């Protein structure tokens, strides 16, 4: 988890560097939107803690079917929460910004709206990433989550630094969804391959 947080921080630094180059309105809009965005991160982290303990206990007890059932239930709960947060943030994005900024300008609203409108619909990817990565880690596979972290880092930096000249602030908005997608492409097949092997061993 410590390494994952370090990778996340490095990616956030790259995103912040690009935002800083776009002016004060972009910085203010991004900062306010990021605070709202952190709600989703906190909720998904809570789900990660729950599924981590559940999978680890059942993996140790050799209860493969309970792992499968628990992961499915966790996915349902996590994605339900993410859908609700997405809808809430999209409907209340301007009042949310006003909670953190007094009298924000139309330009600040433009940046915060753009960030939340692009990123919020992809919270489901963050949910998939949280559940599958934690489940894999809890089954004593550290390699795949490590590789997923590196994919996240590379894609987040590539999106912000590589596409900033072409897309500007939009590059920052798509960076996290791209990183989540890249990590999911690795982790989801990995989880099901592991479950097949565990079932076969049983």
Segments (PLM) and residue ranges:
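Helix-terminus/linker motif at the lipid-water interface of multi-pass membrane proteins
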Residues: 6-35, 39, 57-58, 95-105, ...
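Short runs within selected transmembrane alpha-helices of multi-pass transporters and secretion channels
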Residues: 45-48, 119-138, 144-156, 172-188
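Short alpha-helical transmembrane segments in multi-pass integral membrane proteins
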Residues: 55-122, 163-202
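Hydrophobic faces of transmembrane alpha-helices in multi-pass small-molecule transporters and flippases
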Residues: 1-14, 18-19, 39, 43, ...
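Hydrophobic alpha-helical segments typical of transmembrane helices
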Residues: 2, 14-15, 26, 51, ...
């Amino acid at each position: 988890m410590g390494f994952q947080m370090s990778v996340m921080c490095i990616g956030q630094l790259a995103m912040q560097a690009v935002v800083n180059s776009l002016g004060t309105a972009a910085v203010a809009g991004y900062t306010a939107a990021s605070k709202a965005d952190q709600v989703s991160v906190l909720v998904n982290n809570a789900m990660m803690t729950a599924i981590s303990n559940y999978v680890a206990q059942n993996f140790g007890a050799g209860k493969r079917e309970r792992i499968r059932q628990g992961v499915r239930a966790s996915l349902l709960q996590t994605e339900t929460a993410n859908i609700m947060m997405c809808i809430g943030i999209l409907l209340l994005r301007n009042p949310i910004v006003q909670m953190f900024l007094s009298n924000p300008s139309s330009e600040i609203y433009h940046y915060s709206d753009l960030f939340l409108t692009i990123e919020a619909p992809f919270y489901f990817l963050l949910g998939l990433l949280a559940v599958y990565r934690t489940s894999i880690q809890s089954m004593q596979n550290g390699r795949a989550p490590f590789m997923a972290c590196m994919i996240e880092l590379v894609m987040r930096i590539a999106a912000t630094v590589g596409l900033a000249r072409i897309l500007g602030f939009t590059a920052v908005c798509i960076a996290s969804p791209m990183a989540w997608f890249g990590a999911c492409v690795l982790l989801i097949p990995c989880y099901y391959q592991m479950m097949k092997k565990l079932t076969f061993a049983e």
